[in-house]
């Protein structure tokens, strides 16, 4: 897998653009773009990726890659089956019921929990059958609710495996099920899933619009869903260059009302709000604030491996941004990799950090660790 800088240079030349032209189209400086292409600096903002992709007229995944070489082959084989399950089903209820509904409801809950535990291969293997079966029970409200949850799980799994368009198809199917159900809380939950899929596609303006719309009708006492949507508006505001403070403060207040932080598998809790604050600070380029916030978080309080993995990655990004020693950054990334191998190795910002470190290769001891991780990420061949 090529580094992001190498990919950008290849795409720029393919488009027949000079560095000056790309700078003009993206709003970034020629010097900064040159450093990115030559792996002398790491891209540390999603907005930067979006700007470059827009200037090159390519998708975000064309730049970040789909991680095919380094993803879990067992998990990856599920993508075609999931696609078939979604494209061969609808909500017309014409098919005879498959399976016992109570067992399907339990399976939905289990797979959502397993995805949060980074068990991608297991979840991917079992999702297609579950999706097919749930579509045959759509005359029952509980099946529609379960379908909203199952498609949300599907969207997040697909997004994590680089199948961004499939993530949108899954999330949109869940929204269709929620609309059929007609319950505002579930419609808002499904809308949140759509915002996550859109963010994976780089469509942050659209994600913000959907989140803001859902906040108009989500029940006042649905603190977890309201909080997740509010966090989305805050983060997208950061990506779009705005001020996320008000939204993040509001989310923090909502989190105080939540007794069980993983309702609807959203992990909406005070520590998770801090994690979103860290991500927002990183997007603003305020690495010092991100590092300060990260120092206040006990990863154990995040309770699920998927969020712990994300926290370790964001903490590493913050430390890298304030030029802490490579050893400290690597230690966090290696911990993240142990918790969530694929989530860590396919993260574009992790790849950028490792690519830049690899190009520098400081001291021998650090270089050995960098090369090891770069090899596991499929980057060593480009060094």
Model-derived segments and their meaning:
Residues 57-72, 273:
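Short C-terminal boundary/hinge segments that cap the last helix of small helical domains
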């Amino acid at each position: 897998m090529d580094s992001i800088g190498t990919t950008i240079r290849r795409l720029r030349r393919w488009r027949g653009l000079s560095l000056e032209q790309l700078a003009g189209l993206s709003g970034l400086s020629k010097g900064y773009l040159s450093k990115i292409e030559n792996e002398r600096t790491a891209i540390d903002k999603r907005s930067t990726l979006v700007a470059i992709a827009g200037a090159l007229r390519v998708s975000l995944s064309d730049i970040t890659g789909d991680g095919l070489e380094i993803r879990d082959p067992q998990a990856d084989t599920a993508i075609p089956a999931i696609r078939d399950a979604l494209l061969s089903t609808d909500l017309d209820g014409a098919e005879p019921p498959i399976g016992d509904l109570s067992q399907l409801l339990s399976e939905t809950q289990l797979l959502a929990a397993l995805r949060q535990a980074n068990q991608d291969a297991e979840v991917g293997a079992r999702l297609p059958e579950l999706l097919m079966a749930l579509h045959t029970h759509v005359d029952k409200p509980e099946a529609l609710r379960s379908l909203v949850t199952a498609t949300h799980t599907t969207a997040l799994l697909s997004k994590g495996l680089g199948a961004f368009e499939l993530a949108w198809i899954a999330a949109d199917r869940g929204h269709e099920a929620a609309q059929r159900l007609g319950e505002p809380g579930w419609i808002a939950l499904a809308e949140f899933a759509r915002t996550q899929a859109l963010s994976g596609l780089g469509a942050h303006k659209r994600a913000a619009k959907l989140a803001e719309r859902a906040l108009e009708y989500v029940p006042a006492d649905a603190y977890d869903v309201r909080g997740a949507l509010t966090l989305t508006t805050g983060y997208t505001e950061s990506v779009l260059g705005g001020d996320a403070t008000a939204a993040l403060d509001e989310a923090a207040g909502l989190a105080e009302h939540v007794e069980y932080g993983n309702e609807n598998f959203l992990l909406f809790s005070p520590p998770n709000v801090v994690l979103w604050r860290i991500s927002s600070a990183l997007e603003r380029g305020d690495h010092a604030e991100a590092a300060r916030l990260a120092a206040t978080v006990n990863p154990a309080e995040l309770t699920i491996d998927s969020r712990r993995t994300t926290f370790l990655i964001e903490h590493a990004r913050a430390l890298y941004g304030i030029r802490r020693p490579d050893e400290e950054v690597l230690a966090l990334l290696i911990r993240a990799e142990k918790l969530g191998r694929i989530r860590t190795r396919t993260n574009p910002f992790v790849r950028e950090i490792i690519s830049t470190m690899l190009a520098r290769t400081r001291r021998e001891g650090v270089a050995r660790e960098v090369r090891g991780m770069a090899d596991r990420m499929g980057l060593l061949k480009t060094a």
